[in-house]
């Protein structure tokens, strides 16, 4: 049993990856599933599509590896966070589609909670803000809108879960109704300080306690899968939400270690150790993966438009044919020629929180070329990430020593060099950038004794390339000041003549 199987259940596809003991990928399979948009702002998945696609990828990955379930030491699960499922305990059938994390239908419920003055209490207890993003209001909406659901919940006939819980229920044919701390901490119902479901928050949202799963550490022997699914029973040893799993897969085990995932947006997590830091900069505090008896926390922030700015260069401006071409175009000029690109197409997120901000390209001159604009677009990803990381260090009151990176845009050397220059710390790209799935595998391995400790995993983590800062701190501060000036311009109250 020299292998680990990781299930990576994402927003648009399900994946399964077989890792060997060295954390290398032996085989992988991926399957997309349909997205449903019944109304503007609504996003749903059919939970049965999620389950069938996930099971199919497990079988395909094992087949590709020419291995069976009996060759796997354990199974780890990582998942899109906050997405909410309610199902019948007797049949395992969902009573409604899964309401996805992007879905905004619960804004009215959130507005009511804010009007009741609950914002401060929610932030203190959960580390989160009242927002449709999190699971609690989605669960409330399903109970309000499905006939008889609230009565059935009171009778103990229904179960709620995030995607990890739903998959484990199916994998064990209803024997286990569980989740881990990292997923529980995204529900608005879990108190990150007591490590328990919070009775007051459940009352505020009118949620019956019988709906909720049991919460365990992320690395834990949860139980075994039913032998019929994969030909032999498999120990479920790891569960974690995708961003926390990536932090674990990057071996960011000590306070002050941070990772940034450069995808369509950017997700940054900073390990704050055994301290849940209350942010003064609009970031959220969340449970990180727990692999032993000690609780672990992280600060989290996100940039709305990261790699998406490159898609806009391709599809909106038609400046490039493929996203990968951006690096060559940006490298055709020595710098951005004074151009600053603020890609606030959907407002500005942390640490600015300005939903009305619009995008802008500032500092154009007669000598500006498409190369300068491409370079400024890439630089915008690093500027936003730097502003966010600076807010994190102010909150955590401790310095970040290096930034570990993953995600699609982390393949871009120009971006990572500029990121290191702005931050003044090394930026490190690992050999294995499938860090989300790797985190789930590591957790499962630690729970089952396949790995002895986090230290063994940390020794295994390897850098592929480290980018060291080459510009002076004065120059970096000057560049950040240019960025902040450009941001101030997009936030000016605009006069459109009405």
UniProtKB/Swiss-Prot annotation:
Inhibited by fructose 1,6-bisphosphate (FBP). ADP binds at residues 11, 15, 264, 307, 408, 412. Sn-glycerol 3-phosphate binds at residues 11, 81-82, 133, 242. Glycerol binds at residues 81-82, 133, 242-243. Coiled coil: none annotated. Signal peptide: none annotated. Keywords: ATP-binding, Glycerol metabolism, Kinase, Nucleotide-binding, Transferase. ATP binds at residues 11-13, 264, 307, 311, 408. The keyword ATP-binding applies. Pathway: Polyol metabolism; glycerol degradation via glycerol kinase pathway; sn-glycerol 3-phosphate from glycerol: step 1/1. InterPro entries: ATPase_NBD (IPR043129), Carb_kinase_FGGY (IPR000577), Carb_kinase_FGGY_CS (IPR018483), FGGY_C (IPR018485), FGGY_N (IPR018484), Glycerol_kin (IPR005999). Its EC number is 2.7.1.30. GO terms for biological process: glycerol catabolic process; glycerol metabolic process; glycerol-3-phosphate metabolic process. It comes from the Bacteria. One of its GO terms (molecular function) is ATP binding. Gene3D superfamilies: 3.30.420.40. Pfam families: FGGY_C, FGGY_N. One of its GO terms (cellular component) is cytosol. It catalyses: glycerol + ATP = sn-glycerol 3-phosphate + ADP + H(+). HAMAP family: Glycerol_kin. Belongs to the FGGY kinase family. Key enzyme in the regulation of glycerol uptake and metabolism. Catalyzes the phosphorylation of glycerol to yield sn-glycerol 3-phosphate. This is Glycerol kinase. It comes from Ralstonia nicotianae (strain ATCC BAA-1114 / GMI1000) (Ralstonia solanacearum). The lineage of its organism: Bacteria, Pseudomonadati, Pseudomonadota, Betaproteobacteria, Burkholderiales.
């Amino acid at each position: 049993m020299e292998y680990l199987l990781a299930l990576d259940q994402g927003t648009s596809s399900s994946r399964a990856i077989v890792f060997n003991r060295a954390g290398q990928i032996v085989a992988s399979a991926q399957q997309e599933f349909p997205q449903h948009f019944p109304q503007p702002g609504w996003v749903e998945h059919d939970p049965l599509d999620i389950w069938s696609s996930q099971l199919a990828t497990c079988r395909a990955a094992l087949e590709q590896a020419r291995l069976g379930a009996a060759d796997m030491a354990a199974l780890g699960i990582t998942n899109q966070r906050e997405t909410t499922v309610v199902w019948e305990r007797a049949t395992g059938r969902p009573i409604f589609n899964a309401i996805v994390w992007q879905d905004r239908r619960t804004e009215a419920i959130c507005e009511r909670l804010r009007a009741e003055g609950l914002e401060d209490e929610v932030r203190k207890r959960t580390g989160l803000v009242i927002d449709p993003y999190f699971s609690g209001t989605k669960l409330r909406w399903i109970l309000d809108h499905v006939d008889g659901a609230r009565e059935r919940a009171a009778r103990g006939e229904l179960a709620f879960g995030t995607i990890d819980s739903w998959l484990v229920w199916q994998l064990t044919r209803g024997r286990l109704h569980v989740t881990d701390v990292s997923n529980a901490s995204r529900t608005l119902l879990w108190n990150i300080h007591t490590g328990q479901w919070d009775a007051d928050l459940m009352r505020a949202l009118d949620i019956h306690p019988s709906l909720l799963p049991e919460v365990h550490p992320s690395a834990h022997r949860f139980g075994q899968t039913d032998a019929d699914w994969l030909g032999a029973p498999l120990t479920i040893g790891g569960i974690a939400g995708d961003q926390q799993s990536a932090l674990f897969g990057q071996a960011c085990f000590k306070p002050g270690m941070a990772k940034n995932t450069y995808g369509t947006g950017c997700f940054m997590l900073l390990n704050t150790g055994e301290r849940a830091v209350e942010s003064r900069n609009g970031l959220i505090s969340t449970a990180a993966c727990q692999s032993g008896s000690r609780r672990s926390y992280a600060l989290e922030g996100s940039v709305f438009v990261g790699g998406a700015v490159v898609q806009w260069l391709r599809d909106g401006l038609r400046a490039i044919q493929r996203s990968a071409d951006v690096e060559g175009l940006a490298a055709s000029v020595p710098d951005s020629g004074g151009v600053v690109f603020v890609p606030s197409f959907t407002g500005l997120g942390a640490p600015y929180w300005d939903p009305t901000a619009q995008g802008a390209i500032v500092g154009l001159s007669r000598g500006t070329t498409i190369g300068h604009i491409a370079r400024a677009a890439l630089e915008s990803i690093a500027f936003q990430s730097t502003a966010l990381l600076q807010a994190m260090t102010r909150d955590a009151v401790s310095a970040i020593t290096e930034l570990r990176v993953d995600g699609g845009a982390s393949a871009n050397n120009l971006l990572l060099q500029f990121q290191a220059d702005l931050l003044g710390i090394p930026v490190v790209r690992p050999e294995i950038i499938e860090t989300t799935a790797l985190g789930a595998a590591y957790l499962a391995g630690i729970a089952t004794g396949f790995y002895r400790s986090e230290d063994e995993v940390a020794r295994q983590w390897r850098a592929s390339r480290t980018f060291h800062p080459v510009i002076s701190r004065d120059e970096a501060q000057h560049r950040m000041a240019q960025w902040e000036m450009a941001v101030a311009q997009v936030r000016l109250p605009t006069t459109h003549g009405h």
